[in-house]
């Protein structure tokens, strides 16, 4: 969302979710793939988001981008001390006016194994785990 208006950000727009961000609010869109900080502040972020996940689960809501939606809501209410530039999560194949520092690989590319392989869906590893579970149940 580099150089885009916040109306194009894919924030959670359902007001029943703890991740809800109203139209017109928000200055940045934070990617969930890279985060960190001082211990106390980072643990506060983690415990807050954990409680929001529990609250949304109780209400049968999953934010549009899961934890990333919650991180955006958290940073809207608690602006971070430092916001890294987009070069730190530069999507592969994009043309942006700066050099990438951390490149996000396109998980759908076959040379990386594809999305299912990377998420271990329908992989040999999943099948082995299921067989092991069945063996334990049979004992």
Residue ranges and their predicted role:
Residues 19, 99-102, 133:
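Residue-level marker of intrinsically disordered, low-complexity segments enriched
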Residues 13-15, 24, 46, 78, ...:
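Generic alpha-helical secondary structure signal
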Residues 1-19:
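Conserved donor-nucleotide/metal-binding helix-loop-beta segment in metal-dependent transferases, i.e.
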Residues 24-108:
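Catalytic core and acceptor-binding pocket of nucleotide-sugar-dependent glycosyltransferases
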Residues 110-139:
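Membrane-proximal basic amphipathic "stem/tether" segments
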Residues 2-6, 100, 104-119:
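Secretory-pathway lumenal glyco-enzymes, predominantly type II signal-anchor Golgi glycosyltransferases
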């Amino acid at each position: 969302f580099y150089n885009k208006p916040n109306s194009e950000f894919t924030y959670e727009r359902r007001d029943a979710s703890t991740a809800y961000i109203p139209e017109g609010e928000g200055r940045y869109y934070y990617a969930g793939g890279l985060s960190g900080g001082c211990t106390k502040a980072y643990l506060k972020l983690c415990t807050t988001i954990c409680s929001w996940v529990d609250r949304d689960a109780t209400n049968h809501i999953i934010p549009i981008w899961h934890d990333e939606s919650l991180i955006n809501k958290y940073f809207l209410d608690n602006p971070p001390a430092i916001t890294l530039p987009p070069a730190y999560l530069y999507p592969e194949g994009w043309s942006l006016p700066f050099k990438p520092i951390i490149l996000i690989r396109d998980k759908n590319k076959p040379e990386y194994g594809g999305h299912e392989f990377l998420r271990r869906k329908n992989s040999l590893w999943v099948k082995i785990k299921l067989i092991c579970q069945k063996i334990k149940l049979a004992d």
